From Swiss-Prot:
Region spans: Disordered: 1-82, 118-148, 175-203
Protein name, entry field: DNA mismatch repair protein MSH3
Keyword flag Cell wall biogenesis/degradation: no
Organism from which the protein derives: Cryptococcus neoformans var. neoformans serotype D (strain JEC21 / ATCC MYA-565)
Subunit description: Heterodimer consisting of MSH2-MSH3 (MutS beta). Forms a ternary complex with MutL alpha (MLH1-PMS1).
Region called Mispair-binding domain, residue ranges: 233-347
Biased composition regions of type Low complexity, renumbered to the chain: 122-135
Coiled coil, from the record: none
Compositionally skewed regions (Basic and acidic residues) per UniProt: 139-148, 193-203
A biological-process GO annotation: mismatch repair
Regions of compositional bias (Polar residues) in chain numbering: 1-11, 54-65
Pfam families named in the record: MutS_I, MutS_II, MutS_III, MutS_IV, MutS_V
Family under the similarity heading: Belongs to the DNA mismatch repair MutS family. MSH3 subfamily.
Cellular localisation: Nucleus
């Protein structure tokens, strides 16, 4: 037996290190010495709980070898002072593993070293005398070897969870995090010996495990002197790596509401979590340093749309690596790599299917929700950039406004420049038509009047029946020269075939710089940094060169050029700048081919929404919309809001509608069948233009286009009478070859699965993909060859690789066979019956294979984007798709015209409007009672101004609205609800109806009336239709009469068709008497029956009848409204009294006038003809009132 205190040669070789390294270690409140000689071979040394009796008993429980060893003793702890090392390991202190560190209690840790230290002498013990090393028996040596095997394989402090190479990488990262200097590869022999004994190798492995454990503990606690001080959050805890990721991205996107992908959820943090909780109704709770709220991944797109509709800018941070790849990667101990890959606003959200969990699995991708006839048209989600310049530098009352509107979902672009008055009615009209979801405005602020209009427009979403409008303020609005240079560079730079993918939103390599040279467009770079050559072509539909596009820009007004530069610059951040590629899609808002309906007209006539709750139900678009496709709904909304001025175009639409109603031929039925299950081709092709379509989407588009193009044979000639209907059979076959060629390039099965890597039917189309696939095949072949070797090692001829939880190429070994598993295999996972391993060779090959797979993903994505760019060059696909939308609109109008009582309007050249048996189109659909028709005729012979009087609730406002709606419907090209309509083309329909204030804009009710009237007077022409309802009622009677009289007199002189509703009989009779050839009086008829109690029973007939009617029957309407009878009686008495007083005053006026006439007659101061004229005027006054000569 060896003597006490002697050293054991086997232990010496076991713990020996040739190139010692210093590794720090620190444990709070733990002053115990780690005595490895006392450690059991099959138990784990616990360092966390120094006071645990269980841990101390574990260190005393050991195999028979350690129990029988003379130096074996329990490990004790002195909590007051650090204890001294035992004599058995005086020469083996852990000085290089655990250096002295101050504890929280102010005591120093005792240190020891695994390397012999001849000069080490404890303070309290003399240096032991040298003695020969004890000799082990054969049984002891056997037990020792068994212990070495167990300590390398079993769980515990020295458990080898991964391969040695990967463990060393982790240790290196921990040392780097601890601030230690790397001295080279640890345990690297410095003696130059290539040969190492088995015991030396085992000793090195144990040392590595111990070193890794200590380094890991050090990195976890951060108590090293060289480690950076952890940043402490508001909770008093250090920021986690995930929180640091969020803070870093949030710092760069302060105005963005961020969602971060974490596992199977998307999480909000900080103030974003509170906002999400408030807006989405989800729970937000404090978690370490931030509030946190989360949503499941499959609900992401739903919540994103909700936040966008509320006006937020939303960013989605996604994980850029999978859990399976991370487990075998070099950064497996670091957090998942994440980037801001999606950025959206309400206007720039183009239904990205990658946000939908079902998009990749669905084989019938639809680009919008199913179309339900009669539902609201899809929102335009327009983005409007606005700039202005004062007309007079001394005042900003009148300004010149430049406006550019882009609809990213469809690629439609509208521009305009116009002068606007102090009340900004022109701007308000354009906003009402365009209905933007987002406004781009200068940060320096516009004029006060403009800001007031924009703020009012964006601030009342509920009143206007739409979502909130988001306002984005833009810095550094350029001057005209800088904006023109920017646009010139934009159209000179050819879009690279493989456009940079949406990837990292914060990567602004291709964005504009704002350095010394503002608004400069940097040329795009290839992956190797070389400049991509410029190209003159800019993908215009007609294939014109960029020089011609620049000439087009020269014709644009200056403010429009500035607005366009602002819009393009903003959309580049979202990857949507390609919307401006096709200048053929540019349309001016105000042009000579369309009627301009003002915002007041849109609201008063209920064109887009009703006035009750701002909804669709009861509006004109609700009545006319029976479209089967989303693109048809959008186009019909444009038709309804912008009636035509071209008689030929109007007749073409009406003729097409008539033929659809009458023609039931085979070709017509085939035309109807085209609309069945039709996806939104325009929106889908626009996504292709942006490079944002999925393979499934693109396949659906191409299949649909091929089906459409195959319906009609080429050169069929004119199969319909209508030229609009003939456009479809004539144009569809022209895209067959192009669509079929693109479709043949795809592997449809893989496209349905969104498999970009295996998408192409011809592998040689993109050789880079095949090259990477070949490299992957080589790796897989090597793995198969290695499998043969593993079968021999494990003696399992049927051994196969398995995949568990996304981890591939696992070698599964039953627990009973683990003894034959080589020590260098890395254990990945285990169950009760099997262990799963990766061999070093598998790790190396799979790592290389993973790199190739990542490269394949990048190359395949670039190839698919290049293919989308190639498809987008054929703009005729979009043109044909828009023709399908035209057919859908005509079919919808034909369905409306099929209702009974509709007629085809007749257009004439001379100014005229004649309506026979006209009806209100929406009222007759909403009410069960039949609508009482009306007749009206405007012409030079019949007069152009009709004054309408009559009782309240008699139908005056409904009748004049019906007349205006009939004109609008006729100039849309639709049939109209009347027996017969003959009209000339009206260039505008102007209305001023109702009474409401605009407190938000600082306008009273009367001020609103006058502002709207002023706008009408400035814009009407002899070919306008004007509707004025009770002008002047917002002020005193005398002022109201004066304003109504003067306004109507002025309009009558212009000669436009006018409907003037009033309760001022004086105005009506005076103007009708003064201008009988232009102005005539009409009223809504009624029956009045006297009741026995002295009251009257009124029956409204709702018929438009010639003549003036003074009675308004306001008390009767109050009775219908349910006012109490005492109030009604008092009101009736007061009304009678006021009427008597008025008649008395009139009799006095008549008496004085008669006296004056007689006096002049007897004095011969007045000619007989003048006397006759005075008598006639007096007679008219008396006949129009209730005063008689007898009174």
């Amino acid at each position: 037996m060896p003597s006490e205190g002697s050293q054991q040669p086997s232990l010496d070789s076991f713990f020996k290190r040739k190139n010692p390294r210093v590794e720090p270690y620190s444990r709070t409140g733990n002053n115990a010495i780690i005595d490895l000689t006392d450690s059991p071979p099959n138990k784990k040394i616990k360092l966390d709980d120094e006071g645990s009796q269980k841990n101390r008993s574990m260190t005393q429980t050991s195999s028979s070898y350690f129990k029988g060893h003379p130096t074996a003793r329990p490990l004790s702890v002195d909590k007051r002072l650090p204890r001294k090392p035992s004599a058995a390991i005086q020469a083996y202190k852990l000085q290089d593993v655990i250096p002295p560190q101050p504890s929280h209690s102010g005591l120093a840790f005792e240190t020891c070293s695994l390397v012999p230290q001849a000069s080490f002498v404890p303070d309290s013990q003399p240096e032991p005398s040298a003695s020969p090393a004890p000799q082990r028996t054969t049984e002891q040596l056997k037990r020792h070897e068994e212990w070495k095997t167990r300590i390398l394989a079993m769980s515990g402090s020295f458990r080898r969870k991964r391969s040695l190479a990967l463990d060393e990488a982790v240790a290196a990262e921990a040392r780097e995090a601890a601030g230690l200097e790397d001295e080279g590869t640890p345990f690297d022999g410095s003696d130059g010996d290539d040969y190492k004994s088995e015991s030396e190798k085992n000793a090195e492995e144990v040392g590595k495990q111990l070193k890794k454990y200590v380094a890991k503990e050090l990195a976890g606690k951060g108590k090293s002197k060289g480690k950076k001080k952890e940043e402490i959050g508001p909770s008093g805890l250090a920021y986690t790596p995930l929180e640091k990721q969020f803070m870093e991205i949030k710092e760069q996107n302060r105005d963005v509401l961020l969602l971060m992908e974490v596992g199977y959820k998307y999480k909000f943090h900080g103030e974003d979590a509170k906002t999400a909780s408030r807006e989405l109704g989800i729970v937000a709770f404090p978690n370490r340093n931030f509030f946190t709220a989360s949503i499941p991944t499959h609900r992401l797109h739903i919540h994103v749309k909700k936040l966008l509709s509320l006006g937020y800018k939303v960013g989605v941070i996604t994980q850029t690596e999978t859990a399976a790849l991370k487990k075998i990667g070099d950064n497996r101990n670091a957090p998942f790599a994440r980037k801001l890959t999606h950025l959206f606003t309400a206007a720039t959200y183009v239904e990205d299917p990658s946000l939908s969990s079902s998009s990749s699995s669905s084989s019938s991708v639809r680009f919008d929700d199913p179309v339900v006839p009669g539902t609201a048209p899809p929102p335009t989600n327009a983005l409007v950039a606005i700039v202005e310049q004062p007309v007079d530098r001394a005042s900003d009352d009148r300004v010149k406004v430049g406006l550019v509107c882009v609809v990213p979902g469809t690629g439609d672009i509208t521009w305009d420049e116009f002068d606007d008055s102090q009340i900004r009615t022109e701007l308000e009209t354009r906003l009402a038509h365009l209905s933007p979801a987002e406004l781009l405005l200068p940060k320096q602020r516009l004029s006060k009047a403009t800001e007031k209009v924009l703020t009012y427009f964006a601030g009342e979403p509920k009143h206007r029946g739409r979502n909130a409008v988001r306002i984005e303020r833009i810095d550094n609005i350029p001057e005209y020269d800088a904006a023109f240079d920017f646009l010139t560079n934009f159209y000179h730079c050819k879009e690279h075939k493989a456009t940079v993918s949406k990837g990292d939103v914060n990567d602004e390599r291709h964005l504009m710089t704002e350095g010394n040279k503002q608004w400069s467009l940097q040329p795009k770079l290839s992956q190797d940094g070389a400049d991509i050559s410029l190209d003159e072509e800019i993908y215009l539909a007609s294939g014109v060169s960029s020089s011609k596009a620049i000439l087009t820009l020269v014709d644009f007004p200056k403010q429009v050029v500035i607005s366009m530069a602002v819009a393009i610059r903003y959309m580049k951040r979202f990857g949507l700048e390609n919307a401006f590629k096709h200048t053929s899609s540019f349309v001016r808002f105000a042009n000579r081919s369309h009627m301009l309906l003002s915002s007041n007209t849109l609201a008063n006539l209920e064109i887009y929404q009703n006035q009750t709750d701002g909804g669709l139900y009861g509006s004109l678009i609700w009545l006319l919309d029976h479209c089967k496709t989303r693109m048809g709904k959008r186009l019909l909304r444009e038709w309804v809001g912008r009636p035509l001025l071209d008689v030929a175009a109007l007749k073409a639409r009406a003729d097409a509608i008539e033929e659809i109603m009458e023609n039931n031929s085979y070709h017509m039925e085939k035309l109807r069948s085209l609309l069945i299950n039709m996806p939104d081709l325009v929106r889908g092709l626009t996504r292709v233009q942006y490079g944002k379509a999925t393979p499934n989407e693109l396949a659906t588009l191409l299949i649909t286009l091929v089906r459409l193009a195959s319906e009609f044979k080429p050169n069929m000639g004119n199969v319909f009478r209508s030229c609009l209907l003939n456009n479809i059979p004539n144009t569809l076959p022209t895209i067959l070859d192009t669509s079929q060629r693109f479709l043949n390039a795809l592997n449809l099965k893989q496209a349905r699965e969104n498999d970009v890597a295996n998408l192409w039917a011809d592998p040689d189309r993109f050789p880079d993909i095949q090259d990477v696939k070949d490299c992957i095949s080589v790796c897989e072949m090597e793995l198969n060859e290695h499998l043969m070797e593993l079968r021999k090692i494990l003696k399992k001829p049927t051994l196969r690789y398995i995949t568990v939880s996304g981890i591939e190429y696992l070698v599964e070994v039953p627990i009973r066979d683990t003894k034959i598993v080589p020590a260098q295999w890395m254990k990945i996972s285990a169950t009760r019956t099997v262990n799963r391993y990766h061999t070093p060779k598998i790790l190396a090959i799979t790592k290389e294979r993973t790199q190739h797979l990542e490269k394949l993903s990048i190359v395949a994505r670039e190839a698919f984007i290049a293919f989308q760019s190639e498809v987008a060059e054929y703009h005729e696909l979009v043109v044909v798709s828009k023709q399908i939308a035209v057919i859908d609109c005509l079919m919808s109008l034909a369905q409306t015209a099929a209702a009974s009582g509709y007629c085809k309007p007749k257009f004439v050249a001379e100014p005229e409007l004649k309506i026979l048996a006209g009806r209100h189109p929406m009222v007759e659909m909403l009410r069960e009672e039949s609508y009482v028709p009306f007749d009206i005729h405007f012409s030079k012979e019949e007069g152009t101004t009709k004054i309408i009087t009559g009782p309240n609730m008699a139908g005056k406002s409904s009748t004049v609205r019906a007349m205006a709606l009939i004109v609008c419907m006729a100039q849309i090209g639709s049939f109209v609800p009347a027996a017969s309509v003959t009209l000339s083309v009206h260039d505008s329909v102007q209305t001023r109806m109702g009474a409401s204030d605009e407190i938000g804009r600082g306008k009273s009710t009367f001020m609103v009336e006058l502002s709207e009237t002023s706008d009408i007077l400035q814009t009407i022409t002899p070919r306008s239709l004007v509707v004025l309802d009770e002008l002047g009622r917002g002020t005193s009677t005398y002022d109201g009469i004066a304003i109504a009289y003067a306004t109507l007199s002025h309009i009558a002189e212009i000669g436009c068709n006018t409907l003037f509703v009033t309760h001022y009989p004086t105005v009506a009779q005076d103007l009708a008497r003064e201008k009988p050839d232009k102005i005539s009086n009409w009223h809504m008829s009624f029956d009045e029956i006297q009741m026995p109690d002295g009251g009257a029973e009124i029956t409204f007939l709702y018929q438009l009848t010639r003549g003036l009617q003074e009675a308004s029957f306001g008390v009767w309407c109050a009775r219908l409204a349910g006012l109490p009878k005492p109030i009604l009686d008092t009101a009736q008495m007061r009304s009678s009294s006021l009427k008597a007083e008025t008649q008395e005053r009139l009799r006095g006026i008549v008496a004085r006038r008669v006296g004056w006439m007689l006096h002049n007659l007897f004095d011969n101061k007045t000619s007989s003809s003048q006397v006759l004229r005075n008598v006639e005027m007096l007679h008219n006054s008396l006949s129009s009132s209730s005063i008689s000569f007898s009174q």
